[in-house]
Swiss-Prot record:
Higher taxonomy: Bacteria, Bacillati, Actinomycetota, Actinomycetes, Mycobacteriales
Positions bound to Ni(2+): D91, H93, H104, H107
CDD domains tied to this protein: HTH_ARSR (cd00090)
Name of the gene encoding the protein in the UniProt record: nmtR
Oligomer status and interactors: Homodimer.
UniProt name for this protein: HTH-type transcriptional regulator NmtR
Gene3D superfamilies, alphabetized: Winged helix-like DNA-binding domain superfamily/Winged helix DNA-binding domain
UniProt KW keywords: DNA-binding, Metal-binding, Nickel, Repressor, Transcription, Transcription regulation
Main function: Represses transcription of ctpJ/nmtA, by binding to its promoter region.
Source taxon at top rank: Bacteria
GO molecular function per UniProt: DNA binding; DNA-binding transcription factor activity; metal ion binding
Pfam families with a match to the protein in the record: HTH_5
Length: 120
């Protein structure tokens, strides 16, 4: 699969069932408000679990559980720093995916569209 939007490195072929399942798992991870809040906070930079929990107003154990799910899906990484684990987004693709989801939601809310003129 490729990377990008609007003609920039689009996938060269339709998704097969395995790739479709992987994409669905990623999108399911984004379908949980608490995970979106975590990813949005990490969009601003790496944080240890304690700071992340405080920033989004969740219990540390709940944040740790959600981070484990996000890590297993390849959306975040954790690096040990002394006795803490500092989490960050896996890469810029995760930030772009998050940005596009937020952008799309805002456009729907405002009744806007970025449809190409030939899209009818």
């Amino acid at each position: 699969m490729g990377h990008g939007v609007e003609g920039r490195n689009r996938p060269s072929a339709p998704l097969d069932s395995q790739a479709a399942a992987q994409v669905a798992s990623t999108l399911q991870a984004l379908a949980t408000p608490s995970r979106l809040m975590i990813l949005t906070q990490l969009r601003n930079g790496p944080l240890p679990v304690t700071d992340l929990a405080e920033a989004i107003g969740m219990e540390q154990s709940a944040v740790s559980h959600q981070l484990r799910v996000l890590r297993n899906l390849g959306l975040v990484v954790g690096d040990r720093a002394g006795r803490s684990i500092v989490y960050s987004l896996y890469d810029t693709h995760v930030a772009q995916l998050l940005d596009e989801a937020i952008y799309h939601s805002e456009h729907l809310h405002l009744g806007l569209s970025d449809r190409h003129p030939s899209a009818g």
